[in-house]
Amino acid sequence: MKSVQQFISNNFLPFLVVAFAAGILTGSLADLPLNVTFAFAILTGLVLPICYLKAADLSGYLTTILLFFIAGITAGTISSQEPNEPHHIYNLIDQQRDIVAVGRLLTMPSFDGTTSQAKINLQSIRIGTDLPHQPAIGTILLRIPAPWPQEYRPGTLLAIRAIMQRPAAYGVPGVFDYPAELARQNIWVTAFSRSTAQLHAIADTTTLLQNIRYIPEIMRNSVGEFLDDHTDHEIAGLYRAILLGDRSRLPDTTLEYFKASGTMHILAISGIHLTIIGALLFSLLYWLLRRSEWLLLHTNVKKVTGLICLPLLLGYTLLAGSNTPVIRACIMSMVFIFAFCNDRTRTLSSLIAFGALLILASSPQTLFTVSFQLSFAAFISIALIMPVIQPLIHNQLDKGPMTFRQVAASLRNWALSALFASTAAVLGTAPIVIYHFHRLPLAGPIANLVMEPLICLWALPFGFLALPFIGFVPTIATALLTIGSGGLHLAVSFAELIQMVPKTSLWLPRPAVFLVILYYCALSLMLLSQGLNIKLFRRHLSACLYILLLALLIFPVSPHLISNSKTAAVNFLDVGQGSATLIRFPDNTHMLIDGGGSAFSRETVGQRIIAPFLWDSGITKLETIVLTHPDGDHTNGVPFLLEHFSVQQLFISNYSSGNKQYEELIKMARRQGVKVNQAYSGDILQAGETSVICLANTGLEYGGGNNEGLVISLQRGNTRLLFPGDIDSNTEKGLIAMGKTLSSDILLAAHHGSSSSNSPEFLEQVAPQTIIVSAGRSRKTLFPSEQLREYCTIRQIPLLETSEKGSIRLELKEQTTEIAMLKDLQKNPLRRRHDTWQTTERITVRKE
């Protein structure tokens, strides 16, 4: 018992942080009433001081840890609440509205080449033309499809006409939760203006405090404009990333180079950036202060220098945008400087824990951000792994004059230390990287060994030194930036070289949470066994356990392989204005019917939605893809799937359609070794008890356009599903005239439910028990049409829209078809889960 108490005593602060973080997790996910939470808070406040006084024994330690867990529950519950102020924009906007708003530009706008984004701090809004302005508070994220006007700088009061709405998440398990990400930045409403003509500056008087508040962002904006004007596009984007924390102007290809090489963290201002900048400031200031004899005699010059660095680092944090990663890095830097000034630098675990506690106490929801998880996982893994490896790689150097052999040995030690530190960071962050990004950069240690010095020790110092000269001697600033750009060019070239090597970056399914926990437990056990006096067999056993769990992360077992379910499942994915339907057959093979959707971001719908869903489901292979017709909203996500899911065969309606993207897709499929087949009427695309048949290739009978497509029928027993693609009403009538068997239990509405399709005659022939519409949220009055809504209402046919329900899953059983939808899709984004399905309806199989 004494050994347990001693272990807790030596690591008391880390235990408190873990308990506090676990409490935040519990409070954020559990729907606890606020009165219970406040009772917990009062209890903690009363009992905690007593526990500190009695923390010398084990019961005192455990009670204190428990109270920190309760404090975490309180913090997690309160921080995950929706805004409750009546004038908050979140409570004024419950649906999409055309709004006139007055607000102040809060930060430097970003521009990715097509769209500008800006944070606006609201003062008032007007809903409709007949109502007066009413007070409004809160921050909105404004998007404009044009470059931001340079005359509107941070602090400018603007009148804005925009479409406002609460941000909507794609209802697809495994997909990035954008509304939750915004909510953690205290943004609960987004806005869209069609052009810069809908922005107008308002003359107003500001106080001195307001002017001071916006100075860092004004300076940041000016630095960004200088970088754009005095360096080329790619270099300006890189400098913006490492100096200002703005990655929006980086070309897509450059971003992919850094992602694939495992060096994306270098482009985010983090601990390593502030460490380099802090070391540079410390060296310059220390050299200057040592010129003073009085300071040398009366003070500890190193500690004075460290304290002077504090406000300078804080100022740079403000200049870099004060984003969460920058603030976190600044807090950690300040913690280490204070520890240095108090001679407490040897307690590394306590320093890391204290920094984490400060961050979580000030912003509990930071726990759920990827940057927080990766930063501390890397930091802790390096701190734990390197002491074990260090004795194995360091040669003892002889004292005296440095010989060539000693210099070589010193360089070898440094290179090996850097390589193993990078490897330790990769091992420590691997589960988190795979969980959030579905990829593991195997070349990360080598890439970091080369690229970190090029960017952090070459480009970053010269870029930082250029900052004070921008406003005074721009020629010197330009010269320094030019020197630093050499490191950036070399880093990009090396990253491009890494990407050209096959299999240096693996795309992997999302691991189960329990597997991630077991991985870290095994890693900790292996490291502890190396430092304790235990038998060699147990050391080897812990190492084997760790290697096994690492293998399970890279080569996971599909959940369907260990399932006894013999049912077929059909998933209608929420891809916006498009269509993508995944079919899982009882033998655990898969077919995707169409794979396209809304195309408004850098990533295609395949990378953004379909692939994450497949990985989240444990699927790494797609046996078949069927494309009903060449339109982009049915095909634009398929190229990514062809690259990463070992597709065996592709069924299409036509080889040539005049659509360049579609024809390039077919060429790409052939390069990948995919068997490309044109489907004809009556072709069996999948045989067995769950069969898929091509009822018609309408392009061969009715010409091009939306009618150039396949009509697909899925049958399991007496249950039928119909996928008509985007055919119009004339083609529907043609199918009826040809005597096609159209009767189906489930119908995926033609052309996303538009009025040009889904004729009453066609619907009468199909006689569906349920109609599903795959459409986006932006044009809900058109997709589905009023005629289809009315038809379903009169006949009491359930009309399920992916724009409202999210993804819709069907389980095709012998006697029934169960329809399930995601639970809590409309809840507070900080509390909802995107992986909980809830059965809402059962359809009895109709008898022949």
PLM segments and residue spans:
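Hydrophobic alpha-helical segments of integral membrane proteins
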Residues: 208, 212-230, 238, 246, ...
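Non-globular, low-confidence helical/coil segments that flank catalytic cores
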Residues: 104, 128, 147-157, 161, ...
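Membrane-embedded alpha-helical segments of integral membrane proteins
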Residues: 7-53, 369-372, 376, 478-530
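N-terminal leader/targeting segments
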Residues: 1-92, 96-98, 200, 205, ...
